[in-house]
Amino acid sequence: MPIIKLIASIILLPLISAQFVFAQVTSSVIGKGWANNSVNTIIFRKNSLVSYKGYQYAAYYSEGKKVVLAKRKSGSQEWLTRETDFKGKTEDAHNVISIMVDGEGYLHLAWDHHNNPLHYSRSVEPGSLEMISPTSMIGRNEKELSYPEFYRLPDGNLLFFYRDGGSGRGDLIINKYDTKSKTWARLQDKLISGERKRNAYWQAFVDSKGTIHISWVWRESPDVSSNHDMCYARSDDGGYTWVKSNGEKYSLPITATTAEHALNIPQKSELINQTSMGTDKKGNAFIVSYWRDQNQTVPQYHLIYNLGKGWDSFALDLRKTPFSLSGGGTKRIPISRPQVMIKGAGKKASVLMIFRDEERGGKASALLIPKLGKRKWEITDLTEENLGSWEPSFDTELWREKQILNLFIQRTEQADGEGITDIQPQEVKVLEFKPEF
């Protein structure tokens, strides 16, 4: 039977930096969750947290591998939690939980996917944590899913991105949910095709105008070191037609031959897959990732962007420690993949990047570029504790609507190559602050 309980806990952390101020950082505890690998704290959870009309929702795996759903009034210290009967193979860190709330207030849930059949449900009514029995979306291409991601459009309808097929041979598929009919339909059978030779690892973003931006690296095999290049596309009509940054229309599916290259990055550059992107107020695309430049030994974070006159990039030379991404499975990596948020526009845009680095004690950290054109930055730590293998995920809708940043926080420990570690369940928290920059 489902378990429902109320939890209240809040910690106040003062945090002050020279250029940007987080006057009060609050950390609210939801409960304890599975921590034996990074499945609860992988960056490609879209979403781990989501807000809608004054309420916030969260999801994570319990120690018993069950999906736990949580809800609170925005800013409240009290969480209502519900342990569902849905279980996941938590030993595989790919099998993340993703949630989103549609424009009618229904909660949508996808969980436990790594080259296996669709696991999807939605709430029985708006605002509820009680879910219907698992169901299909459209009944096609639902047997070998990975990387489920929800995105809410300005009209309240949803998009559902996923990979159909295994690593090195998968295609990107998009479904669309209509809130009026409460049904899913296929939007793109193969937006990006690896032609059974490779696959795209993407990150996507829906801007304030509803334009869908997507960027991706190609991978030639299950070996992470075969990642290469950074490509880009966008849709101005809800995902039906796609264009390059110069407005040139794509013939679909997009392939390695036809894709626009934002940046050429060779294989064996320690280029990571599945990071994040965003846009400035004018809809200009920004992408963050990390890789090792040629003739360098240390992978560094990089910012890639296009202000309307072509692609540009620069390295954030923060790091001193080399590492390698060679091999398959989920790696134990000394840094997290980064999340990015942008304020302002053009060369005056401010860029905020959230990340974790063992060189900084494994804390959640924030890097601010106050003015893009100056290419200078500063870093502030957001937590005091070492978060192990944590990667940042956040409430995209709360940030979009109110510029309040809520991060999903949990200490997790990932073994290299898809193993699990010996660690007790760890607290699942939401760290909330409003960056002033």
Enumerate the predicted regions with their spans.
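Positively charged n-region of N-terminal signal peptides that target proteins for export
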Residues: 1-7
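Bacterial N-terminal signal peptides
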Residues: 8-19
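Extracellular, repeat-based ectodomains that mediate carbohydrate processing or recognition
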Residues: 24-437
